[in-house]
Amino acid sequence: MREFCPLIGVIGRSGAGKNVVSRLLAERGCYCIDADARTRELLESYGDSIVERFQVAAAARGLSLRRKDGGLHSAHLGVLLFSEPKLLQQHEEFLLPKVTRLLCEDIARAQAARPKAIVLNAPTLHKTELLQACSFVLYIWAPSILRMWRCKKRERVSFTHLLRRFSAQKGFYAQSIAQNADTYTVANCGRVASLARKVDCILTRRGVLGE
């Protein structure tokens, strides 16, 4: 039985293919944790608090943070936050500690299952202390134009919003490296089979596969 279960971080900018890589890792016996899913849960749980924090700024931009059913309008929240870095920072200071606590609980449960590795699919991993807990990090990369196409295909948002989001994510790789994380860049520009070979090569090199 494996005595040490490595923690693998998966990061990258919007549209790079983090979820595809996570699925590949799951197929290879890894336990995958989706930080975005946890974040969405918290957005619903703390929706009233978030609306209270940002409703004035949202109204000034003609945005409503409430859906018709009364829930938090996460798409409008994203438009607001990515248009103003200070608001994004305030939101992250409020939410990220809560996300991190949930992820720590998820990691503890995953360790009990003794998988080949635990995968933390977390775009903002570099903004939490969990980055230092990772054995290594996969930074998923794709050209901006390809990422733009992927995002437009799956989301009903404007090009302006996507450009602002992309701009806010510029420092992901540099911040990971700055914290001395053992980071591998994985290009995702073609077929899934090619991406899978790259992932397998890294997993084999790190001893996750081939035992």
Swiss-Prot record:
* A matching Pfam family: CoaE
Residue ranges annotated for the DPCK domain, each copy included: 7-211
Q: List the disulfide bonds.
A: none
Is Kinase there in the keyword field? Answer: yes
Asked if the Swiss-Prot or TrEMBL record annotates the protein with the keyword DNA-binding, the reply is: no
Annotated ATP binding sites:
G15, A16, G17, K18, N19, V20
Biological process terms in GO annotation: coenzyme A biosynthetic process
* Biological role stated in the UniProt entry: Catalyzes the phosphorylation of the 3'-hydroxyl group of dephosphocoenzyme A to form coenzyme A.
Task: Tell me what this protein is called.
Answer: Dephospho-CoA kinase
Q: Which organism is it from?
A: Treponema pallidum (strain Nichols)
The organism's lineage?
Bacteria, Pseudomonadati, Spirochaetota, Spirochaetia, Spirochaetales
Gene coding for it: coaE
